[in-house]
Amino acid sequence: MGEAEVILRLAIYYIKNNLTKEPVRVSIDGAHVKTGSKVHFDIFEFCNRNGLLKMDANLNRWQGEYELQGYESHIIISSEPGVGDVNINLPDGSIIYAECKKGKNDKRGQEYPLMREAIGQLMTGCDFGVKTVPMVAVPDTGKARELAIRWSKLAQIKAIGIKFALISEDGSVSLL
């Protein structure tokens, strides 16, 4: 599962489970969607398959506001650097600030360096307010789950409040 899909699945999960009523803001690096003429992630097909309808008039541009059919909250997709991959305002006033990474369930073992990179991005990407919930979101693989369980028990991860979201291809999310 690529990074753009992880980002969108996390946003959809929070909306479908009524965990937010606010617009969910996501930032997707254009290179994760397309480089030159090579499409890496067909964002239009994904949105169509998952009930996301573009709300603005520019249907050729993947950035913009999308409605998730049957839900109050929308997803606003941009490609703005330095704002985190997913920002979700929760009803209690806290804000999830998530860094997302790709992953495959294979023997290459990308999870360790990618999850460490996401933690580093959280630590250096923005100032956390008292209501910021820093989160690492990755595909739910055996290795990612093992690392999330182990790292979520570390005193320094607890002190900072980093949460882990393990994203499944069926759209389910395990929060640790």
Spans of model-derived segments:
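Surface-exposed cleft-lining segments at the edges of enzyme active sites
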Residues: 70-74, 103-110
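Acidic-basic catalytic patches of nuclease active cores, encompassing PD-(D/E)XK
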Residues: 1-83, 89-92
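A short acidic, often aromatic-flanked loop/helix-cap motif at beta-alpha or helix-coil junctions
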Residues: 31-34, 167-175
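Flexible, glycine-rich phosphate/dinucleotide-binding loops
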Residues: 95, 106, 143-144, 173
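Nucleic-acid nuclease catalytic cores
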Residues: 126-171
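Histidine-anchored nucleotide/phosphate-binding helix
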Residues: 117-127
